[in-house]
Amino acid sequence: NRFLARNCVFLSIIPKLFPNLSVNLLLRTPQKISYITLTMNDFRFLVITCLIAMLSCTSSLAQLAKRSGSVSKSQSADFQIQASKKIDRLVGADFRRKQIRPLGKANDAEFMRRAYLNAIGRIPSYEEAVSFLNDESPDKRNNLIDSLLGSYGYNMHMFNWWADLLRATDEFEDTSGAPYIKWIKDSIAENKSYKSMVHELISATGGGWQNGAVGYYVRDQGMLKDNMANTTRIFLGTRIECAQCHNHPFDSWKQMDFYQMAAFTNGIKTAKSHLSNYLEDKEDMDGVSRDLIDVSRLIRYAVYDFSIQDTGTGTIRLPKDYKYRDGDPGERVGAKSLSQFGKTVKVSTRSKSTDPGKSRVKFADWLVSPDNPRFTKVIANRMWKRVMATGLFEPLDNFSSASEPSNSALMSYLEELLIDLDYDLLAFQKILYKSYSFQLRPNAIQHPDRSPYHFNGRQLKRLSAEQIWDSLLTLKIKEPDKRLGNGYTGDAIMYRGRPVLVGKKSMRDLYNEVMEIESGDEVWDYTKKLHDQIKSDKGVKSGGGESMQMMMAYNAGKKYG
């Protein structure tokens, strides 16, 4: 039918061209379905059929090419080169305006070391260095960038960056951070867009062993106001924590602004907290063995406490000592995004819990939307600093109303480019790495803090702890990027610091079984049963060494390590 509608003009002239051909057409309209009946006494019908098929295929292929072109722009080598050249033109224009004499181009050895340390977080091995330095191809620098950014080393180095940004750790007090760590690593490995990652983090709900993104809130459990302060610092480049207690003395943020933002995530609760409390009460009873208490705590901390059941009320009460005219002490206010960042989103206060379960989703939608241009500006600047060593505005997380990028035209283009790439951070970095600006010689002149740095080569900086460690490993072992993790437990059940029931039951299994339990007596019976299973596990009896080896092999096979 689509074919008939597309080619109706051509079909209408068939009877005039071929009088021996009888053609009856009912062309498609929005209300009707089209049919075609052909009676042929002339072999020329075969020719017509072929021509019609060619027309239809040509149209379909053109549409397919158009669609695939928009999807693969970030993979287009020509697009990357043109974008890199535009960045260089904008940097060069700033040189002329500021009368800066550009540094020369870094030699191959300087470029190689910089590329390795920046892209995968370590120095090149001897073999890698010899291979690159002896390469005489004109595109060897771009080829090296492609190779490094496509390696496992890039994933691990990028994980270090994300872990630092999100303050991710192996443990959250008494709860394992393994699901959160794995979610971050998996997101990097599949090259999930920055926009998608942030939206998933902010709107995350469920259990950690089903959705590791809930670790973003479990990390700050019981400190939701601090979590919101970190959210605005990380994703909006703005520090509003000062306004938690009073209006900001040097910026436009008010205490009301802080509480309206905090309302988006206020009221988040862990799943089935009544059963968690039941286990805690049981642990305090006389006659309960220490072993059973430890198993009970395993269930409480790793299952119930690592889950988000309620996504927030969307309202919050002002503190009792609130003293400003725009609100009363103890007054309940609705969530509202910061008006300084463009179009706002609000949650009403008409009921105690307005739009239950949707306030965080509304916040996540607004945070990553075009209505909030600050979101794009902040991550574009973070990526520029990651590659070029110094941000277009500094500090990265304190962009105030008085802040101005050192190169406004370049900042605007980087924002435009990131949107054009659909927030593909890998493609964005590749463009920066392939620019001539990245290849300038290092700038050894110390730049004053908190003053605009008009880019003229990467400033020298100390290596991070991770870069030092991975570089030392490069001197000692072969293929350092392929080494297994150092005791990363994946989804193994950890009891007293040792993996148990390896290959028999995982934390995902444990989570699913526990979350089906509805009563306190049932969860206590399950706890005792799990205790017996753990005590009979050979890994525990042998001191854990055998179990640890089994766990590492098991996790490596399942790609957890």
Task: Kindly label every feature range from the protein language model.
Residues 473-561:
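Long, His/Glu/Asp-enriched segments that create or flank divalent metal/ion-associated functional microenvironments
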Residues 65-85:
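Short N-terminal segments immediately surrounding and downstream of signal-peptide cleavage
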Residues 81-113, 123-153, 167-484, 488-498:
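Primarily short, surface-exposed interaction patches in extracytoplasmic proteins
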Residues 2-4, 8-11, 21, 25:
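Short hydrophobic targeting helices and cationic amphipathic motifs
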Residues 48-56:
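Bacterial N-terminal signal peptides
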Residues 37-47:
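Bacterial N-terminal signal peptides that target proteins for export
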Residues 20, 24-39:
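Short, Lys/Arg-enriched N-terminal segments with co-localized hydrophobic residues
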